[in-house]
């Protein structure tokens, strides 16, 4: 039973699916995808449940969400184990994701009251009241890299605001999604308030194209996001929020400070989660001369020693595999393409067991036209620059704009950087993948259009209703011209 529709676990009626552990290639889940008809059943169930859920007192909605948070905390080790098993990420890392699921719920509760609650003030004897109302039926598309944490950051705010939801997880992480839905079921969520449809592209297309949804929250690739954007053109009545990827630049100044701390920050930025975070550094800008040489030599040396392995190996690895062998092959192909364009391999990506790919560092300063691509894996491109304005100009040469970073102890350099860089998340002397749940997450250009995560997700799950209210009608001392009573 792979679909959760109207509070019932159902078998899919579409094509067969399975999920493999990307390290061992062992099958860990199997089922059948939802058909277009089943997707419509889920949307209809959500529409029917909306009538009651939107008028359910906030305290009751909040109680269900808080019960879910308790269950996530209680079962955090099981969740972490399932994420590790299905994504291949090391268990130490997936434990942090399970913890983040609980933390994001607390943020969402606070955000509801601060951003979409009810506010009132008096204006010349009239009550000016701001209320918020749910959008309706929301579709949530989840990614595979954080299959528990990221969908949670959309589903929880949507439910708190009184929306009902149809969730379509990544077809690469169906088991994590299924285990998470079981916790929602245990939390006492009424039937139809949250539904899940499993499947690949046909299932996603059916959900995105359903006339019964009022909004769609998407986290995933730029290519898929752009397809959705075109699909929703001419439909201003539907809310579409896209969180996509980035070709993220990291600039290292000559005034970088301590060498090993800088190298560690680069490694954490480029190779955490085997490079499968949308904020990972893809392009590294190093100064020409001995300062840049020292960093590059130490970086290659340290990266070559990174421990890579299965999710449950002891001692724990820093990196696991790519999500699939297809994804792993894509990184090897990207490396070959950069070499064909004139890139020099300083550290070669090599295929290992399952979907393992070792880190690659490629010098691409002599590549005439560097492809503006998000290589979603452990592939770091190195470019040498002359001065900071040169580095920032090169860093901004991308259609994306998700994250960027500067390593520098010089305050004036940091001021120049934040005044001129084009990105939504900009860090100084910290890894690019570090972001606060209280801050907007996203960026301009091909990286997305809104910021519907964590604290700011509340803004995209409810619409504001503004009212001017008086106890009774009033006749002014002076009537408007042209009116006689």
Swiss-Prot record:
Active site: 243, 278
Chain sites annotated for binding NAD(+): 220-225
InterPro entries: Ald_DH/histidinol_DH, Ald_DH_C, Ald_DH_CS_CYS, Ald_DH_CS_GLU, Ald_DH_N, Aldehyde_DH_dom, SuccinylGlu_semiald_DH_AstD
Alphabetical keyword list: Arginine metabolism, NAD, Oxidoreductase
Record carries keyword 4Fe-4S: no
MF GO annotations: succinylglutamate-semialdehyde dehydrogenase activity
GO BP of this protein: arginine catabolic process to glutamate; arginine catabolic process to succinate
Enzyme Commission no: 1.2.1.71
CDD domains given in the database record: ALDH_SGSD_AstD
The reaction(s) this protein catalyses: N-succinyl-L-glutamate 5-semialdehyde + NAD(+) + H2O = N-succinyl-L-glutamate + NADH + 2 H(+)
HAMAP family given in the database record: Aldedh_AstD
Protein name: N-succinylglutamate 5-semialdehyde dehydrogenase
Lineage of origin: Bacteria, Pseudomonadati, Pseudomonadota, Gammaproteobacteria, Vibrionales
Gene: astD
């Amino acid at each position: 039973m792979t679909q959760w529709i109207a509070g019932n676990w159902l078998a899919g009626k579409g094509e067969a699916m399975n999920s493999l552990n990307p390290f061992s290639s062992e099958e860990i889940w199997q089922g059948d995808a939802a058909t277009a008809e089943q997707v419509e059943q889920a949307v209809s169930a959500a529409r029917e449940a909306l009538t009651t859920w939107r008028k359910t007192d906030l305290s009751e909605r909040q109680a269900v969400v808080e019960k879910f948070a308790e269950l996530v905390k209680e079962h955090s080790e099981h969740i972490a184990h399932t994420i590790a098993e299905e994504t291949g990420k090391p268990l130490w890392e997936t434990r942090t994701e399970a913890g983040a699921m609980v933390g994001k719920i607390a943020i969402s509760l606070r955000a509801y009251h601060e951003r979409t609650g009810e506010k009132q003030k008096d204006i010349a004897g009239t009550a000016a009241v701001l209320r918020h109302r749910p959008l309706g039926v929301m579709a949530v598309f989840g990614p595979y890299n954080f299959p528990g944490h990221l969908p949670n950051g959309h589903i929880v705010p949507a439910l708190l605001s009184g929306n009902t939801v149809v969730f379509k997880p990544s077809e690469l992480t169906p088991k994590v999604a299924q285990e998470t839905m079981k916790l929602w079921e245990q939390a006492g969520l009424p039937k139809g308030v949250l539904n899940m449809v499993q499947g690949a592209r046909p299932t996603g297309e059916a959900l995105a194209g359903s006339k019964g949804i009022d909004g769609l929250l998407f986290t995933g690739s730029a290519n898929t996001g752009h397809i959705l954007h075109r699909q929703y053109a001419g439909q201003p009545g539907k809310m579409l929020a896209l969180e996509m990827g980035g070709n993220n630049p990291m600039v290292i100044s000559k005034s970088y400070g301590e060498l090993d701390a800088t190298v560690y920050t680069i490694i954490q930025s480029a190779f955490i989660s085997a490079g499968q975070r949308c904020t990972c550094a893809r392009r590294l800008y190093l100064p020409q001369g001995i300062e840049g040489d020292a960093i590059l030599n130490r970086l290659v040396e340290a990266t070559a020693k990174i421990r890579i392995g299965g999710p449950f190996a002891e001692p724990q690895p820093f990196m696991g595999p790519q999500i699939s062998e297809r994804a792993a092959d894509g990184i090897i192909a990207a490396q070959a393409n950069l070499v064909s364009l004139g890139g020099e391999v300083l550290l070669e990506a090599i295929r290992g067991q399952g979907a393992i790919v070792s880190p690659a560092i490629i010098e691409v300063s002599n590549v005439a036209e560097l492809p503006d691509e998000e290589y979603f894996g452990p592939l770091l491109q190195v470019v040498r620059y002359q001065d900071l304005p040169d580095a920032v100009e090169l860093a901004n040469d991308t259609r994306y704009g998700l994250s960027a970073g500067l390593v520098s102890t010089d305050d004036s350099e940091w001021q120049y950087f934040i005044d001129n860089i084009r990105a939504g998340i900009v860090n100084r002397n910290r890894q690019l993948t570090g972001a606060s749940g209280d801050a907007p997450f996203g960026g301009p250009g091909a990286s997305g259009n809104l910021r519907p995560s964590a604290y700011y997700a509340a803004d995209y799950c409810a619409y504001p209703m503004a009212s001017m209210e008086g106890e009774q009608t009033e006749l002014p001392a002076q009537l408007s011209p042209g009116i006689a009573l």
